Every structure is written in structure tokens, then in C-alpha cells.
């Protein structure tokens, strides 16, 4: 048996599985699951974690919270904290994640094997597929206003598009693809999803839900909302009496680049030397929250999950700058010419328009006349050198 297997390219990031898991053995975007390799049991010095007939058994009374299990976990899902039962992140084969998944893409190989969904990734610079439901979630997140909704479908103006992929990362129904690749989805959390007494039982929300996740009980005249869903807001938008309220909090968009400085998410462990080394500090061309919740390079404590943001030199700020203070320059590395952001403080009027459109939220006004703007990358590659010293090689030149 091989633990929990999620078909990542089909996942809607609804988090139903992670909410259902009693031992926190699933994380979504980025994906981490327990594979039942039993490395944690082998590392446990007290027998609190043991393998028994292909299952992991945990005895909290024997746990000394040493953290050996978390250190040994190859996927990084195992964790130890002060919340009972202390050691978390191991699959107990309860199958609750399988039952919770609304699109049946979770398997437990050797026990429950679900057929993979066919996912065809368009090999075009940017493409909106037939999966688009016209929910418009992509429209407000586009930093250059390149997306509109026409005839209930998202339409992208390729003359404006900077291919930052924020739309693809945000799309609730996996309908947008950039550069022929599977998008690295943003984290999201439904903060509240409610229906009030104003509901008139018209069932419009049931009809428009693309995933058939909303039900209506005609006997009790009650609309039942799902505990977790892709959060496209169509139900809320179409309710004729505004009885549905959906509040969603998105994580930061991930830096996706095809050329120049490239971040390899699967290699990053959010350690931070790259952010600290960036010579524009405190201009923060790289922002990170490490595994301990420490924001770098500012070194301020947060309660956020690990994240990585960097200037991707997309040019949104350059396009928006009304004074010419920001422009796209060139730099040569290893005989190849790359784009980089160049800034002239004397031309900056501190209007903040560049800050508003930055898809990575790295640009900030400082109030310093000599250096009024921070957060742009000059492609010096000092971050790559710092990362290489950690032997992670999560940053590279491409």
C-alpha cells in the first residue's frame, strides 16, 4: 500500500480532503501527503509510532515530542507540535479523504484505485479551455486588465497579457493554462460560506453550480451548501435575493517564469538565504515566509504558512508607470541576454500605480526620497549563489 495519492493536475484545490483528514496527513497547493513509507516509525525512539500490518499506529502516551518523525518524513507532511495528539501527518487509512473528494481523484493504491481523469494541457502561450464557467474570478486578479467576460467565457487580450499566470493559478475550475504547463495553484481558504433566511428556495444556486455541489431539500425548504468547494462565487453572483455569502482568502500568487531567474517549487524548503542575500535589501525583490513563520528579509514573526514571492520581471510595473521611472532593461549572463527591471528614482512621483499592479506584491513605496521604491529585480543572481550553498538549487538561470 502506498498511502494517499492525489491526481494533482485535476485537483480543484477545494480542500475537502484536507478538511476531512483527522490526522492532517494532506496539504494542498503545494501538495503533500503521507505515502506510508514508515520512515517516521523507524525514526521514533520510544515506539509511539509503529508499523503494524501495513498501518501506522500512534500512541500519544509514548510520544516525547522529539520531532524525529518529522525530520525523517520524506514528503514533509509529518509534524510535531504542542496540540494533542502532538504527532500529526500520518495516514491511518480511514479513507475519509477519498469519500470527501467531490471529483473522485484520490486513491489509496492497493486499497482504493480511482481511474485517472484525462487532462489535456493546451500547448499555446495562453489558453482558456471549455472548462471555463465564466465565474470571473480571473478578471480582478489580472494585473494588466487583460481579461474580460464575454458570452459567459473568459477572454484574454493577448496584446495586454504579460503571461504572469496569476489567472491560471487562481481559476477555480482549472480552465486557464499558460505556456503549455499545469498551473501551480494558489492556496485558498473559505473563511465563510452561508445562506440566510432570505433564501426563497428558487434553486438557482443549485442550477448554476458547475460541480453539482449544492443541494436543495424540498421537504425542509433548505439549501445545503458544501463544506468545501472550488469557490467560484457563481452561486453568490446568481442568487436573486442575495441570500448567499462566500468569503475566500487567497494565498500569494507563485512566481512562475520561463526564462531568466526561475524558482523550482519542488526543491525549495523555504530556508531564506536567497531573500537575505538579495543586494536590494531592504527592497525585498524576494519575500519569503519560512517554516517557522518568520518573514524574510524583514525577520518579523507571522502566523502564515511558508510562501515564496519574487519579482518575475513581467513588466506590469513598467507598462503602468506614467513617468518612465521604471523600464525594462537588459543584462547579459553566460552570453545570453535577459530582461531586468531598471528604476530611475529622479523620475518617480510615488504615485503607487506600479505597486497596485505587481502580481507578486513585492513592490512597495518607501517614503525615502533617495530610494522611493523597493521590490524590483535587477537579475544580479546573488540569490542563486545563496541558494546553491544550501545545496537545494531551488533557484536557477534559464
Swiss-Prot record:
Disulfide bond entries: none
Domain of life: Archaea
InterPro entries named among the record's database cross-references: 4Fe4S_Fe-S-bd (IPR017896), 4Fe4S_Fe_S_CS (IPR017900), Fe-S_Ferredoxin (IPR050572)
Known cofactor(s): [4Fe-4S] cluster
Cofactor: how bound: Binds 12 [4Fe-4S] clusters.
Entry keywords, A to Z: 4Fe-4S, Electron transport, Iron, Iron-sulfur, Metal-binding, Repeat, Transport
List of residues binding [4Fe-4S] cluster: 11, 14, 17, 21, 34, 37, 40, 44, 63, 66, 69, 73, 91, 94, 97, 101, 132, 135, 138, 142, 161, 164, 167, 171, 199, 202, 205, 209, 229, 232, 235, 239, 268, 271, 274, 278, 311, 314, 317, 321, 348, 351, 354, 358, 377, 380, 383, 387
Gene Ontology molecular function terms on file: 4 iron, 4 sulfur cluster binding; metal ion binding; oxidoreductase activity
Keyword Iron: yes
Domain 4Fe-4S ferredoxin-type, residue spans: 2-31, 25-53, 54-83, 82-111, 123-152, 152-181, 191-219, 220-249, 259-291, 300-331, 339-368
CDD domains referenced in this protein's UniProt entry, alphabetically: MtMvhB_like
NCBIfam families with a match to the protein in the record: Vhu_polyferre
UniProt-listed PANTHER family: ADENYLYLSULFATE REDUCTASE, BETA SUBUNIT (PTHR43687), FERREDOXIN III (PTHR43687:SF1)
Descriptive protein name: Polyferredoxin protein VhuB
Source organism phylogeny: Archaea, Methanobacteriati, Methanobacteriota, Methanomada group, Methanococci
Gene that this sequence comes from: vhuB
